């Protein structure tokens, strides 16, 4: 993949690359198969579901020229901005795309006067925990999916300086 400047933009009504976006998420989350239990909710996503998600939430895509290389969905909550489905194509992991999308989420939180970013990551994904910690997130809770008696995910938050 030729490296061009990465452009982060919001998903608007003109976005029509839903199948490509679904493929990106599935490929970015594929390494979790057989590692996390229960399996990732990404497996339940559909093209229609993603389009609905984009209408209900605020989506961002990362573009390398005309190539879709990342995405992030944000959902404003009462006291925070929830971040979900942060995905980067596997061959671009570690290239700063995720951090750039996080910066877009931080700008959105500032614009909405939301002082905290919140996300959830699976207990087993310790590399993700370390990455989010480097980005300023701290562990705030452990949660269990329905039917599980052990923690299956952790919540992490990042406090933002508003002003």
Residue locations for each model-derived region?
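Active-site acidic-Proline motif in GNAT/NAT acetyltransferases
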Residues: 76, 89-91, 95, 123
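Conserved N-terminal entry element of GNAT/NAT acetyltransferase domains
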Residues: 1-16, 161-163
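Conserved beta-strand in the GNAT
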Residues: 61, 67-75, 82-87
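Conserved GNAT acetyl-CoA-binding A-motif
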Residues: 109-121
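Conserved catalytic-core motifs of GNAT/GCN5-like acyltransferases
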Residues: 118-122, 133-155
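A short helix-loop-beta-strand connector motif used in the catalytic cores of GNAT acetyltransferases and
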Residues: 49-61, 82
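Conserved acetyl-CoA-binding loop-helix of GNAT-fold acetyltransferases
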Residues: 88, 94-107, 134
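Conserved GNAT-fold acetyl-CoA-binding loop/helix
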Residues: 13, 23-50
């Amino acid at each position: 993949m030729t490296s061009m400047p990465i452009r982060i933009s919001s998903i608007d009504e003109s976005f029509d690359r839903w199948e490509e976006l679904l493929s990106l998420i599935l490929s970015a989350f594929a390494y979790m198969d057989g590692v996390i239990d229960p399996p990732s909710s990404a497996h339940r996503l559909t093209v229609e579901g993603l389009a609905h998600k984009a209408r209900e939430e605020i989506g961002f895509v990362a573009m390398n020229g005309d190539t879709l290389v990342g995405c992030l969905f944000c959902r404003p909550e009462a006291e925070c901005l929830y971040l979900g489905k942060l995905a980067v194509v596997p061959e671009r992991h570690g290239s700063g795309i995720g951090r750039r999308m996080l910066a877009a989420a931080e700008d959105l939180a500032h614009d909405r006067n939301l002082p905290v970013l919140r996300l959830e990551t699976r207990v087993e994904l310790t590399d993700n925990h370390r990455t989010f910690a480097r980005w300023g997130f701290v562990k705030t809770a452990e949660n269990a999916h329905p039917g599980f008696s052990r923690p299956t995910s952790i919540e992490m938050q990042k406090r933002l300086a508003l002003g």
